[in-house]
């Protein structure tokens, strides 16, 4: 049995799964993605999503509606007559009509071990919380927020230095393998679904702007987790006194040290190192970015920046 699919996704994270479906020879009737976004200083140029770019390169019809709640969009989706909809970080709510249209339903690749970290930012929240593992889950979607029954999952460790960027890369490729495995089982009539546990339920809310500012009164381990979770985007930041001027600087890389903290916000500079005293322990800064500048290793950053204080 050859399944007719639609694919719904938007960012880079979704691309490996779409590519895997194409490489496996699946029939993809259409791709749905978020509308092109304004870019450039004046916002005059519209940039298609990474998923839209791949779909166009493969001559697959692409739809970019603002919503799927209208009768017009739901009719258009119904006319595709797909067996399965694959959803990966699409970014739009799927109403009940859409969920029930595909013959076998809609399946989502979610970057956590459900039911832990349901919601918008599962990778970041897992790192922020200090979780030692996370994973990828393929689930059949229902009307709830990531509450549907689980088809497959795979766990991977989170180390003390894992960043969101690194984890997203690994999980997207794991998700690609799981999605191919899931579709193979579905085609053979062998797919088994398991209801999610009612225990260990947590929610991964969107990252708020106020969470991105570093609070040096927190323990070094806490700050290190946030820097890793928010790197490279949106990035953690603090104010620095550089050559007598206050500047906002992003800290995009750090290392834990064994040094005890002597005074919150105290800085120790070496020829190529920057150590900042936190509420508990000290943090070594490894990558920084001034406003409008490039991401630099600490040694390079210090060559052009005389830092006298952080706050």
Curated annotation (Swiss-Prot):
Its EC number is 2.1.2.9. Keywords: Protein biosynthesis, Transferase. One of its GO terms (cellular component) is cytosol. It holds the Pfam family Formyl_trans_C. The keyword Chaperone does not apply. InterPro entries: Fmt, Formyl_trans_C, Formyl_transf_N, Formyl_transf_N_sf, Formyl_transferase-like_C_sf, GART_AS, Met-tRNA-FMT_C, Met-tRNA-FMT_N. GO terms for molecular function: methionyl-tRNA formyltransferase activity. SUPFAM superfamilies: FMT C-terminal domain-like, Formyltransferase. It catalyses: L-methionyl-tRNA(fMet) + (6R)-10-formyltetrahydrofolate = N-formyl-L-methionyl-tRNA(fMet) + (6S)-5,6,7,8-tetrahydrofolate + H(+). (6S)-5,6,7,8-tetrahydrofolate binds at residues 112-115. HAMAP family: Formyl_trans (MF_00182). Belongs to the Fmt family. Attaches a formyl group to the free amino group of methionyl-tRNA(fMet). The formyl group appears to play a dual role in the initiator identity of N-formylmethionyl-tRNA by promoting its recognition by IF2 and preventing the misappropriation of this tRNA by the elongation apparatus. This is Methionyl-tRNA formyltransferase. It comes from Bartonella henselae (strain ATCC 49882 / DSM 28221 / CCUG 30454 / Houston 1) (Rochalimaea henselae).
């Amino acid at each position: 049995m050859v399944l007719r699919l639609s694919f719904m996704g938007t960012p880079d994270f979704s691309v490996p799964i779409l590519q895997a479906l194409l490489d496996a020879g699946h029939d993809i009737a259409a791709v749905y993605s978020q509308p092109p976004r304004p870019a450039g200083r004046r916002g005059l140029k519209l940039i298609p999503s990474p998923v839209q770019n791949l779909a166009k390169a493969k001559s697959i019809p692409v739809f970019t509606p603002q919503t799927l709640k209208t009768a017009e969009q739901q009719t258009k989706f119904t006319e595709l007559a797909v067996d399965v909809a694959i959803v990966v970080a699409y970014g739009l709510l799927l109403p009940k009509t859409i969920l029930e249209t595909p013959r076998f339903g809609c399946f989502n690749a979610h970057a956590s071990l459900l039911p832990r970290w349901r919601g918008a930012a599962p990778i970041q929240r897992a790192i922020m919380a200090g979780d030692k593992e996370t994973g990828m889950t393929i689930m059949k979607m229902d009307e709830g927020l990531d509450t549907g029954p689980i088809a497959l999952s795979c766990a991977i460790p989170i180390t003390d230095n894992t960043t969101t960027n690194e984890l997203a890369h690994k999980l997207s490729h794991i998700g690609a393998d799981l999605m191919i495995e899931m579709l193979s089982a579905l085609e053979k009539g062998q797919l088994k679904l398991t209801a999610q546990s009612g225990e260990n339920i947590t929610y991964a809310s969107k990252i708020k702007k106020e969470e991105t500012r570093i609070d040096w009164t927190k323990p070094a381990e806490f700050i290190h987790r946030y820097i890793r979770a928010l790197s490279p985007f949106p990035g953690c930041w603090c104010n620095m006194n550089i050559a007598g001027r206050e500047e906002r600087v992003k800290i995009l890389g750090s290392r834990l040290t064994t040094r005890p903290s002597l005074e919150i916000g105290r800085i120790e500079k070496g020829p190529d190192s920057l150590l900042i005293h936190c509420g508990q322990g000290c943090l070594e800064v490894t990558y920084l970015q001034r406003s409008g500048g490039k991401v630099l290793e600490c040694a390079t950053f210090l060559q052009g920046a005389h830092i006298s204080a952080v706050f």
